[in-house]
Every structure is written in structure tokens, then in C-alpha cells.
């Protein structure tokens, strides 16, 4: 006799990214996987990010494709932020989010629950919050909704943040006085006690700990984030286990079950069950200049230096000039992604030497580009990067060596691992000088240093491909996360 039990309700997963492109992208990738497996997905923007997208791209950027709208919706919650707040003011963003978002997110969860009554709409079965968005976990726990958390940066960055408390206990943070912020001896303090990263120095820890304020917003927020993540049902990391094995193993002693699913974009590319409709969702406030791809088509294999410092990093006019002069004299063709707001407070005029290279067809400067496609283009032979995690994952998947110029946050931690552990990159001096830029670019493009780094980059590319393909380690973890965790309400 057949069972008369009703079918299980459709899973309804709410995803809450931090309002930054590097955070939104992996959560949207996860949304694609969930949507393709039949889940209803609610993707939550804060007003700040939503308004920035509207201003830059129009309503089409935040409207789900018609083919996906039945089970995919965008919701927006207030965050107390003005559009005048620069996106690189991470402390200001984080402080406003944690002060202002809990109440509106609570209200959203209540409303989503009330919509179920009398309608064919499933209740919320799981909340996936960015680790930075601690209010999402708090509201879910209050409502009795299972929740898991997604850390969108590197595992080594997470381990660095996890040890902020230890830095405070050992008297290293806050810095005793402002002079220590630039004291090389102090910044070189060894941190052999960090498990899985015994080669770390104080300067390699995520930079938000560099403060003299005992009540610093970013330090206190980080401590709160780590406590919240430790209490979650599970933790998703967009990393390659083989790349960060020692670090992930060290994290396992502090956090709930960890699922390494990276590079998530590559897992999606090898998956036959990622929502194609949601691939059209635009998450960038910058318009991609695709003419760079045809420009690359005309360059020899491995000849082009690709330069991009991400969606948030900024530099001074003097630093931009030194980079420009270094690229102009490096001897290789270059593609430089120079955002309109990459220079702090002023528009910088590019030097004649660089403009001459552009006029001769040996250089191209664009405001934004389809980075994953650029990195995989046969003409590209080097990536000059800020060491943001999404950029490094894309470089790993493309097998590109990296010349690093880390700017803030865990980029310094990523850089140390890149140079000392993974072996597929080298570092530029923090004080940018055109001669050093040109010299290091040449060494990476045609010297023995570059040969060594390219060989290691090729090894990591193969490892990433193996993990992401069907049956690989990251592919299997994605299947576990989606099918065994998120689609059944975060139960284990």
C-alpha cells in the first residue's frame, strides 16, 4: 500500500552576502547550484549594495531572469549606509551592518514565514550567511531556523582572524603607540604559535589588527564573527583543500564541520546542474570592457602582463604613477585594469611613457574586464594582483603566476602563503618604485624566477582541475553541502 504522507516541502534557502563584489560572487554561485536543484532561493542585498548596483547598471542588474523568477527572489534590507561611504571603508561598512541589520533581517524572516500561510510558498528551511554578517546567524537562531556560514576569503585569512584574540592576549594588539605601525622590527615579530602557519609574522596577519585603539571596530567585530562562526552548523570555505591543507586541518579544531568547495566557479563549470538562468545576474558595479579579449588575441602566447587590483583596493596618485612607469619600461605588453576610483581622492593623469606604449599597441588600459576569461587567455603570462582571494582562486584555476602587491585585510596573509608555501608567486615592495616594478615583471616574465613560479602555478592548476571535476574533492563537497546540508535545512 502506498504512503499517504505529503511530499516534503520545497527547500527555501536564504543567502546573505557582505556588500562587496568578492563576497557576493561566491554566494551567487552557491545560489545557482541550489536553484538548479529545485530550491527556492532568497538572495538578500543590503540597501548600500543594492543602490550601488541600481545606480551603475539599472534595474536589470537586480531583476532575476524571467526563467528563474518563480523560485528566485531578491530582497533588500536597510543597513544605515549612505552611498557616499566608500566601499574601501571596511570598518565603516562592518560597523553599520552590525548595528543596523539585525532588526530588518528579523522582520524579513518573519515576513517570509507569514507568506507561507495560505500560499504555495515554502517556509525558510536554512539561512546561509557570510561570516561577516553575524546578524544573519543571530536572527536565524532566534527563529529556530538552521543556519550555516560561508567564509568567502581564504582559509589562511580565516585562521589569521581567528587568532586576533590571541594577539590581544599576548599584548601585541592593540599596538602600544602609532610609531609601531611602521616599525619593521615590530611588524617582523614571529608568530610561530599559529597552528598551520608557523612561518607567519605580525605583518602577515590580516591588517585590521594594526590599530592603537583598544576599542577598534574591526578587531571587536572580528572577535564577534569568529565566535558566531564557531557556533554554526557548518562552515563553507571557497578554497582548494590541497592548496590549504595544513590550514584547513588546523581550523577543524576550532570550527564546526568544514566543507572546502573551491574554486567554486570551476566546480560550477564542470557541473551539469547549475542554474544557467542565474548566470545572467549582474553583481558588479563596473561595466566590463570586453574589447580587451580581442586585443589579447593579437598577442603572442604568454607575453602579456595583466594588472588588476580588484574592486576595492585604492592607491595614491604617486603609486599609480610608479606602476604606470614600471609597466611602460618592463619590456612586455600589458593590460591594466584601472578602475575610475582606484586612486584616492583625485584623478591621476597617466604619464606620457605609458600613453606612448598604449598608442603603439603594446599596452591597453581599461576600467574593468571579464577577469576569469582574461586569466585563461593564452596571451597572458603574469598576473600583477592585490592578492584578493577571488583573484587568487581565478589565477590558480588558470595556472597563472602572481606578482603580489597586497593592500588590506587578509591579502597580506594570502601573499605570505603565496610566496612561502604555495610557491606560485613573488611580492612587490610595498613602497612602489617604477624600477622595482619593471625589474620584477621582467624576472617573472623571462627570468629563472618566473620559470620556477610558472611551474608551480601549473601544478596548482592541475590540482584545481582535479578537485573541481565531477567526482573530485571539491565537487564531492559541493554535493554534500547542497544535497545533505542546505536542501535538508542544515541538519547533519
From Swiss-Prot:
Pathway the protein contributes to: Secondary metabolite biosynthesis; dhurrin biosynthesis; dhurrin from L-tyrosine: step 3/3
Residues annotated as binding UDP: 308, 311, 368-369, 386, 390-391, 394
Effect after changing residue 201 to A: 20-fold reduction in catalytic activity with mandelonitrile as substrate
Catalytic residues in the record: 23, 130
Keywords tagged on the record: Cytoplasm, Endoplasmic reticulum, Glycosyltransferase, Membrane, Transferase
Post-translational modification: The N-terminus is partially blocked.
Catalysed transformations (reactions): (S)-4-hydroxymandelonitrile + UDP-alpha-D-glucose = dhurrin + UDP + H(+)
Amino-acid positions noted as binding (S)-4-hydroxymandelonitrile in the UniProt annotation, renumbered to this chain: 23, 225
EC number: 2.4.1.85
Entry's Gene Ontology BP terms: dhurrin biosynthetic process
Residues at which UDP-alpha-D-glucose binds: 152, 371, 386, 389-391, 394, 410-411
Superkingdom in the source lineage: Eukaryota
Membrane-protein topology: Peripheral membrane protein
PANTHER family in the cross-refs: GLUCOSYL/GLUCURONOSYL TRANSFERASES, GLYCOSYLTRANSFERASE
Protein family membership: Belongs to the UDP-glycosyltransferase family.
Name listed for the protein in its UniProt record: UDP-glucose:p-hydroxymandelonitrile O-glucosyltransferase
Organism: Sorghum bicolor (Sorghum)
Lineage: Eukaryota, Viridiplantae, Streptophyta, Embryophyta, Tracheophyta
